[in-house]
Amino acid sequence: YIIEKDNKFYYFGSQGTCLSGTSSTYRVKVGVSDSIFGPYKGSDKKYLDDVNGSFGDLVVAPSDEVAGTGHNTIIKVFDDRDWIMYHGYEINGENPTNRIPFIDELLWDNDTKMPYVKNRKASIHEEKLGPTILKYKE
């Protein structure tokens, strides 16, 4: 998924294994470019496909409670905040083999200018206000 912010383009991609249930290593990483066509780099200044690099900056990763955090989309709401929707497996949930949706606000690192979610983990079991959708367009 690609978004534009402050004249930069941010590519969000999933890395790791997905269809391994609670053993999934999926995570969302991000790279930045001056062009929508790339090349995209992490804050380590290495290209996302550089095997000696970090493959981008971590946005959201698996945790002790949620595995397989990936397949994302970004939503910008009327107050100009960005939100990320993605799926994951609740490891200790009633149906740990079923992927469930998550939504978290994207925060922006003041130093690297890269996006991430709070604690870089899914906000499971946390009460929070989500985005307000004013109008749906088809």
Give residue spans per PLM region.
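Carbohydrate-active catalytic/glycan-binding domains of CAZyme proteins
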Residues: 1-138
